[in-house]
Amino acid sequence: MNALRKLLATGRTIVAPGATDALSAKLIEAHGFDCVYIGSYATAASRFAIPDTGLLSLDELVEQARTIVEAVKLPVIADAEGGFHDAPEIWRTVQAFERAGVAAIHLEDHTGAG
């Protein structure tokens, strides 16, 4: 059973502070949290100093996630926007985050770029 499933099985509230980069993820880990969250807004702001308006590509989100996953031993949950369009792209999105080592993603129910 992976680390996130074990955490969820405890039934307790899990606090997953948002990381903007590997350093902030390391600080989250050092302060004893159980999990790390990566939001698309944090990625857009920290990497490009832009608001989250759906302009980030799947590759940009996954690369940020991979960098954070490699920096910590905690499970990482990532914002995968809207899955990047249709069913085949959503499948590709899931696979890309899985290969990056992300424990879970969430998909938003919006239309638009991401």
Feature names for model-found ranges:
Residues 2-3, 10, 49-78, 100:
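Alpha-helix-loop-beta-strand connector modules within alpha/beta enzyme cores
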Residues 1-18, 22-31:
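N-terminal amphipathic alpha-helix/helix-capping segment at the start of soluble metabolic enzymes
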Residues 25-42, 101:
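Catalytic domains of carbohydrate-active enzymes, especially glycoside hydrolases
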Residues 63-64, 69-77, 85-87, 92, ...:
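Catalytic cores and adjacent flexible loops of soluble metabolic enzymes
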Residues 14-16, 34-35, 75-77, 104-106:
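Structural preference for beta-strand elements that scaffold enzyme active sites
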Residues 36-60, 82-87, 105-114:
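Glycine-rich, proline-tolerant flexible connector loops at the mouths of alpha/beta enzymes
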Residues 17-22, 55-62, 82-100:
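Glycine-rich anion/phosphate-binding loops
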